[in-house]
Swiss-Prot record:
This is Ribonuclease Y. InterPro entries: HD/PDEase_dom, HD_domain, HDIG_dom, KH_dom, KH_dom_type_1, KH_dom_type_1_sf, Ribonuclease_Y, RNase_Y_N. It comes from the Bacteria. The gene is rny. Belongs to the RNase Y family. Its EC number is 3.1.-.-. The keyword Chloroplast does not apply.
Length: 524
């Protein structure tokens, strides 16, 4: 019973303690929550302050960077303005110079017209003077005839003297006729012997093809290669033509690509380049340039080999290497449509055979015949090619007979030996072959194309010039570092104007300026 009473007493006490603990716990929890809130608010304020500070620092940094970038752009703009002003001033100077040249040319034209008028007046005065002089002479002759008619009666002594004079005059006429007949017979005999010698020389020599073609044919294995040669949108053909200066023709002819150019050396270089590209199987602009560089190195061996073969065929050893190389260059030049080396070999063989028939030195005749046109492959000078060829061979102690034959074969100097006459005759025979005179037109066209290229080469900044499309286009390669886009436009106009003033041509000529700038860097 006592235990039950104690339990009833403990239950209310437990409830009281539980309630007290509950309220105490709630009180402490509320106090703790208030503390956490205060701490959180303080932390939030601190974070906001730090963020504001960082934002201000970031803002100051960006303002500094923007100011620096603006100053940099300003400096670049100022520099660009200076460069543009310099270019403008330069172009303005060029325009002023051009205006000065045009004014000077106009003044020269006026002076020339004035001189022509003065010359015309002077010619009229001379003609009038000649007319008066002729009338005076006619009057004097008429008076003399009247005087002779009035003196009809001559004395016996005068008549005898007149008879003697007539007999002497008749004897002189008969003697002159006899001498003239002897001369004609001697000339006929000399012509007969000369014809026999020439016929013997011509019959002993087999002439090769006379006309040099302006086309080269490159055979390919399959027509599928034509698409690779053309390239995407024709870029490979453009790169090939820019590198070689040769037109490449890809048509429906099976397994054939045609190269067209008036310059045989360029055409041979282009042929070697294309053959290298086809053998390697890789065709793109960079590969084209590399193949062209390799072909340019190999062409020197081809030239030397051509010179050595020419000397060997004529049995002419012992020539300096420089002379042999120059002879080899003849393979890539033409004269009146004929390959120059072939023409020189023909002249050498003809001169050698005629020298043998006439018991002269055949070796000297062949040597002079082979070298007579060597001046055509030397750098251009103001001298005729016969004189420049003689001066070139003088440096190698060439025989005086050979030097005279070379210099005299176009009449620039007097012929001093029979060898010189033989070389001149052999040259005329070779150039008189069937088709030679018709080839003169082609040779004139070649010279016209060369003159167009030389006109364009005379301008600053020009690297290479090519006459394409039979002279209807002049493609000019310029230095990208020295010629700007605006200057390229001016250059094209100047070249076209100079061609108009200095060259004669049918139709119109397109002047194309090709400007390329390459930048190379290496990653290490």
């Amino acid at each position: 019973m006592g235990i039950v009473i104690n339990l009833f007493l403990l239950v209310p006490a437990s409830i009281v303690f539980f309630a007290a603990g509950f309220f105490l716990g709630r009180f402490f929890l509320e106090r703790l929550g208030t503390t956490k809130v205060l701490e959180a608010e303080e932390r939030a304020v601190q974070i906001v302050q730090e963020a504001q500070k960082e934002a201000n620092e970031y803002k100051d940094l960006k303002v500094t960077e923007v100011n620096q970038e603006w100053k940099k752009k300003r400096r670049e703009f100022d520099q660009e303005v200076v460069i543009k002003n310099n270019k403008f001033n330069q172009m303005q100077k060029q325009v002023q110079q051009r205006e000065g040249q045009l004014k000077k040319q106009a003044q020269d034209n006026r002076d020339m017209e004035r001189r022509l008028q003065d010359q015309r007046k002077e010619n009229e005065q001379v003609q009038e003077s000649v007319t008066l002089r002729a009338a005076e002479l006619e009057r004097i002759i008429s008076e003399q005839n009247e005087r002779l008619e009035s003196i009809s009666g001559l004395q016996s002594e005068d008549a005898r003297q007149m008879l003697i004079d007539n007999m002497i005059s008749k004897a002189r006429e008969e003697a002159t006729e006899t001498i003239h007949q002897i001369h004609e017979e001697a000339e006929q005999e000399a012509e007969r012997l000369a014809e026999k010698t020439l016929l013997t020389a011509i019959q002993r020599i087999t002439f090769e093809q006379a006309t040099e073609n302006a086309l080269s044919v490159v055979h390919i294995q399959t027509d599928e290669l034509k698409g690779r040669i053309i390239g995407r949108e024709g870029r490979n053909i453009k790169a090939f033509e820019n590198a070689t200066g040769v037109d490449i023709i890809v048509d429906d002819t099976p397994e054939v690509v045609i190269l067209s150019c008036f310059d045989p050396l360029r055409r041979e270089l282009a042929k070697l380049t294309l053959q290298k590209l086809l053998s390697e199987g890789v065709i793109h602009p960079v590969a084209i340039e590399k193949a062209y560089e390799d072909a340019s190195k190999e062409i020197a061996d081809v030239i030397m080999s051509a010179g050595e073969d020419a000397l060997s065929s004529l049995q002419l050893p012992d020539m300096p290497a420089e002379v042999v190389k120059t002879v080899g260059k003849m393979k890539f030049h033409t004269v009146y449509g004929q390959n120059l080396l072939q023409h020189s070999r023909e002249v050498a063989m003809l001169a050698g055979v005629m020298a043998t028939e006439l018991k002269l030195d055949a070796r000297l005749a062949k040597r002079a015949g082979l070298l007579h046109d060597i001046g055509l492959v030397l750098p251009a000078t103001d001298e005729p090619h016969a004189i420049s060829g003689r001066n070139f061979l003088k440096r190698f102690n060439e025989s005086g007979v050979v030097l005279n034959a070379i210099a005299a074969h176009h009449g620039e100097v007097e012929k001093e030996s029979p060898i010189a006459e033989l070389v001149d005759a052999a040259n005329v025979i070779s150039l008189s072959r069937p088709g030679a005179r018709g080839a003169m037109t082609a040779d004139g066209n070649v010279k016209r194309l060369e003159s167009l290229e030389e006109i364009a080469k005379g301008f600053p900044g020009v690297i290479k010039t090519y006459a394409l499309q039979a002279g209807r286009e002049i493609r000019v390669i310029v230095e990208g570092d020295n010629v700007s886009d605006s200057q390229a436009d001016v250059l094209a106009h100047d070249i076209a104007h100079k061609i108009e003033s200095e060259a004669q041509y049918p139709g119109q000529i397109k002047v194309s300026i090709v400007r390329e700038k390459r930048s190379v860097a290496y990653a290490k």
